[in-house]
Amino acid sequence: MKLITGLGNPGRKYDQTKHNTGFMALDHYLEKNGLTLDKNKFEGLWTKQKINGEDVIFLEPQTFMNDSGKSIAQVANFFKIKPEDILVIHDDMDMPIGKIRIRANGKSGGHNGIKSIMACLGTNNFNRLKIGIRHPENESVVSWVLSPFNNDQQKLMDAAFETSENVINDFIKGKNAQYLMNQYN
């Protein structure tokens, strides 16, 4: 069984903001594949599907970003999902807008959602699909991550979401982190 989760903040106020890149990437995948998050439990919106013979749970935690780990840990514990079978999709300010990077483990990189997941799972041994949003140039970090993408930036993000769909499909097919890193980094 696989768990694929996008990180973001709940509510319309944050809907299309840079910090909700994880939600947007997951929403793109779900929409392209005719899926919806039809359950509300474990402090998140989720669905369980069978894809290519694999049980897959898609999750968007409805805690705020900094508490994302609570929802993810509840799902992982309930369904007995191993950390290496989890893929977390999130924004990354240390990468250019629209750049994708896969990681199998590692530090949080200062991302509070990732810190929360590490604390709640008790490990950093879970897969990440990081999508770049870059550092702000002339505004605060908070203003930057809570603002939407402009048109040029959105084009780069749309391409990243297309690539993320391929990453998700390969992850579901059982491709390991090394394969994903070689293919997409």
UniProtKB/Swiss-Prot annotation:
Signal peptide: none annotated. GO terms for cellular component: cytoplasm. Its EC number is 3.1.1.29. Keywords: Cytoplasm, Hydrolase, RNA-binding, tRNA-binding. The record marks 9 as: Discriminates between blocked and unblocked aminoacyl-tRNA. SUPFAM superfamilies: Peptidyl-tRNA hydrolase-like (SSF53178). This is Peptidyl-tRNA hydrolase.
